[in-house]
Amino acid sequence: MNSAVQAQLAELGIEGYLNQHQHKSLLRFLTCGSVDDGKSTLIGRLLHDSKQIYEDQLAAVHNDSQRVGTTGSRPDLALLVDGLQAEREQGITIDVAYRYFSTQKRKFIIADTPGHEQYTRNMATGASTCDLAVILIDARKGVLDQTRRHSFISNLLGLKHFVVAVNKMDLVEFSQQRFEEIKAEYQAFSKNLRGETDIQIIPISALEGDNVVELSQQMAWYQGPTLLEILESVDVVKEKEAGEFRFPVQYVNRPNLDFRGFAGTISSGVVKVGDRITALPSGKSSTVARIVTFDGDLEQAQAGLAVTLTLADEIDISRGDLIVHHGANVELTNHLAADVVWMTEQPLQPGRDYDIKIAGKKTIGRVEHIHHQYDINNLSKHSAAELPLNGIGLCEWTFNESIALDNYQDCADTGGFIIIDRLTNVTVGAGMVSESLTEVTKASSDFSAFELELNALIRKHFPHWDAKDLSELLKK
């Protein structure tokens, strides 16, 4: 048991501690930045200084530091997070590592993401579930290409809170001038980011602990909050509750003939008993009769809660449908523009069918056209015939059916989708809806999706057969 938990148990007792812990708000955040900026060391320092490390963990870190550590005689706190053998041997992060801790004010889930460019897809995976990004910058190197890359991806994935931590200030003699130079450079870059982004920039030393949990004695010129104070005070719950009500149905709950409810997690907004709702895509309406949870019925539920809704009327709703407030403005379309992060070696090419999963709904979609690929080092755009591994671009999609969706910046759950290869069943990309386009009326076809897919494979691997493109024939 760590010392922080021991102190709280002594003060509150077991029941009091569990009750307090249950009602704490949760912040999911990630650490990102260029390789060797100190992301894993920062997480280790947060855990250590907030007294969240068990004695056996600390003893193991001391032992491992003598073998693979990089901090001399001191314990290498990065080893608390870098768990893979390859990570420890190379001194880098490869996989996304998750860590959990809590203070008296809040619970935290940390995603430690890799800095190397070839692991950008891992970083995007970590960012997709987070509310805040801690972006580390080495005070000696300043803003690097990978710093811009991770800032852009975090912004693209809808994160509205950034904490830019200028790390390794101890290696530049805690220079205020150097900090101000980096601050100005990042602020100039951040003007190109989308939407309103809350950016706070602080000087830290993860190795020494300056401005991480306690204010630094070496940087008296800095008068702002510590990193932990920022993490404990940022408000992300109210932002989700302020959005329009969205409830993707994950499961139709019918344990007996007398009960029929629709289970899922509220993506945004608030719902109350008696609210008039509409189910999409059917457009049928009813009234919320009950909000059922494991702990009993609620009169009101907000974003983030897993609930079962029962309705006053028997209307047809199935998995993948979306429940919204009656009269809500929701796009229903099979044609859209979406930013895509590509995550596999085989590039994304227009004309190929993929399985699409969006908010519990599964359908088939294809890229009709790649509008442009982003140069994520300077945020410029250039034309592209295909998207390579780790490439990010704006693509025009058509789906086999109309789906209720939002822009990703408005609601991530109903505006984000994953792209699955239909032959291997491997997730090959992630999409973020940026715009709903005019619905496409598809021509009737004598060719099945399988036949079109087979035709595409034959044309790719056996070009000497001179097979005709069936999808082009359908357009004539």
UniProtKB/Swiss-Prot annotation:
Enzyme class, UniProt record, top EC level: transferase
Spans annotated as G2: 91-95
Catalytic activity: sulfate + ATP + H(+) = adenosine 5'-phosphosulfate + diphosphate
GO MF annotation list: ATP binding; GTP binding; GTPase activity; guanosine tetraphosphate binding; sulfate adenylyltransferase (ATP) activity
Keywords noted in UniProt: ATP-binding, GTP-binding, Nucleotide-binding, Nucleotidyltransferase, Transferase
Binding site for GTP: 33-40, 112-116, 167-170
Residue ranges occupied by any tr-type G domain in the UniProt entry: 24-228
Record region (G5): 205-207
EC number: 2.7.7.4
Entries under Pfam families matching the protein: GTP-eEF1A_C, GTP_EFTU, GTP_EFTU_D2
Transferase in keyword set: yes
Keyword Membrane tagged: no
Annotated region described as G4, given as residue ranges: 167-170
Protein purpose: With CysD forms the ATP sulfurylase (ATPS) that catalyzes the adenylation of sulfate producing adenosine 5'-phosphosulfate (APS) and diphosphate, the first enzymatic step in sulfur assimilation pathway. APS synthesis involves the formation of a high-energy phosphoric-sulfuric acid anhydride bond driven by GTP hydrolysis by CysN coupled to ATP hydrolysis by CysD.
Protein name: Sulfate adenylyltransferase subunit 1
Source organism (scientific name): Vibrio vulnificus (strain CMCP6)
